[in-house]
């Protein structure tokens, strides 16, 4: 059977230990398996800590695999923090994920208050100064902007502003995930901004659940409508 992982670059793999849940892999155990499978590179992600240093420390032990990290701008990492973005860039980080588990949109869907929004307080369309500063830092450091778990309206606003700022690499995270649910018409509108869409295997509906809702059918339909 052909090795399906040979030459693969996976840009979304979670590592632990995480503060709120158990992860299957650390950077070392993950890299060991992936290098043995013949993959080319990994981008390691965590919700509550930056992963650039973890990638940097593990890299010498896996010469046949390229390891990268970044930062998710949740409360635990300082939120919408342009200084953190620049620091992680200096540590070799490649990806900045806008708020994920601590996004206001995410918490609202769980019936919880608070959270981080890219809009000004009380607005549903005006971008906050903190978010603008983060986008400017991403443009300055040439990192990849990932849209995280923001609402669809926030993601659209962020993509437009990122494009205007000259951010070269914009990744729309898992549009099929039930907490985001970006329809194909919205995705089509974003194509003119040169975005990439992340088509994930699936996603859990409950934080404590190990049963994933598979996205194959939705991903295939969106790819057929929009292209790869």
Which residues make up each language-model segment?
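An N-terminally biased module of ancient metal coordination in phosphate/nucleic-acid-related enzymes
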Residues: 1-65
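Short, acidic/polar
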Residues: 22-31, 78-88, 183
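Divalent-metal coordination cores built from histidine and acidic residues
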Residues: 52-117
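Active-site-adjacent C-terminal substructures of enzyme catalytic domains
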Residues: 95-96, 137, 158, 164, ...
